Amino acid sequence: MSSENLPQSPERAESPQAPRRKPRVAVVFGGRSSEHGISVVTAGAVMRAIDRTTYDVLPIGITTDGRWALTADEPERMAITDRKVPDVDRLTESAEGSVVLSVDPGSREVVYTEPGSVPKALGEVDVVFPVLHGPYGEDGTLQGLLELSGVPYVGAGVLASAVGQDKEYMKRVFLSFGLPVGPYEVVRPREWDNDPAAARERIVDFAGEHGWPLFIKPARGGSSMGITKVDSVEGLDAAIEEARRHDPKFLVESLLRGREIECGVLEFEDGPRASVPAEIPPVTSHDFYDFEAKYIDSAAGLVPAPLTEEQTAEVRRLAVAAFDAVSCEGLVRADFFLTEDGTFVINEINTLPGFTPISMYPRMWQESGVDYPELVDRLIQAALSRSTGLR
């Protein structure tokens, strides 16, 4: 990326009378996880929604090999086309240039470096809007870096992000707070590596107790990637291999028969509030609500969900309770099953839910009276008003 194409550093106010510059939002996206492409799509939607009369935007893409790259501010290129998701490598003009964020908590300075060139200061960042899904971004790693740097950021902190990414510990926290959780087993890397036969036998015993089919899923994944529905023991090995391709630790869950219900939580000045819930209807073209159903085939959810007043109140209460149990901040999407006996069971939360044009989280808040641009603005303003460090 040539120097003339680099974004200009925002002007500092030289006197109390000088106009204050607009807050600068760094939208960080991409990353090393298998959800790289969806992160790019989400970032494009967020960038389109940010009010440019109020904020400056600095797009920072992280390549699949972990390089922080300066990308063009062209959100229209960050969309699913021809059933293909975009990636950061196609959005950056330099294969070698890197963006560096200072870890000096008094700086907030961003610098662009390229081999053979003098580093160029890009100015300070006031707030980071991370839209990294999955490991190396949504799991507390990026949040830890931003805490070290003293840069405010949208969404959950280090602990809540880590718990929200690891389905095992998420369920443990839910259970400790008395939230209803379905049957599950965890197979850790050492268990599988040391004695896969014993681990496999434990899974078969779990199926004997709770019945087939089972869902085999990565413990620290998202967007339904790496999840397989297994109808019998014959499909078990392939499903485990697929899950471990995304994460060496995996979960085994029984099928909960019922309806899939989602609810958004957003932090307001007076505390977290829940949106109207949505329902994911059965997807006849897929075994379950998998990656393609979510993002490629545009499976439509029902917003609001056709629930009774009592059911709506209960799922909203549980969503806020899950938000509080994990000590979340900013936003969460909570996913539930409404079982055949009429009880809600929490499946998981997402601390950085998708913001693609068809994502359920913004749709639920749209129906609740908070449109997409206001939703993005509320999240940025909440981050700007919140300090880093212990809070």
Swiss-Prot record:
Pathway assigned in UniProt: Cell wall biogenesis; peptidoglycan biosynthesis
Entry keyword Cytoplasm: yes
GO-annotated molecular function: ATP binding; D-alanine-D-alanine ligase activity; metal ion binding
Localization terms from the record: Cytoplasm
Biological process annotations from GO: cell wall organization; peptidoglycan biosynthetic process; regulation of cell shape
Cofactor remark: Binds 2 magnesium or manganese ions per subunit.
Domain ATP-grasp as annotated: residue spans: 171-381
Keyword ATP-binding attributed: yes
Residue numbers binding Mg(2+) 1: D335, E348
Binding site for Mg(2+) 2: E348, N350
Pfam families: Dala_Dala_lig_C (PF07478), Dala_Dala_lig_N (PF01820)
Cellular component terms (Gene Ontology): cytosol
Chief location: cytoplasm
Catalytic activity: 2 D-alanine + ATP = D-alanyl-D-alanine + ADP + phosphate + H(+)
Binding site for ATP: 207-262
Family listed: Belongs to the D-alanine--D-alanine ligase family.
Protein purpose: Cell wall formation.
Listed name of the protein: D-alanine--D-alanine ligase
Species this chain originates from: Streptomyces griseus subsp. griseus (strain JCM 4626 / CBS 651.72 / NBRC 13350 / KCC S-0626 / ISP 5235)
Gene that encodes the chain: ddl
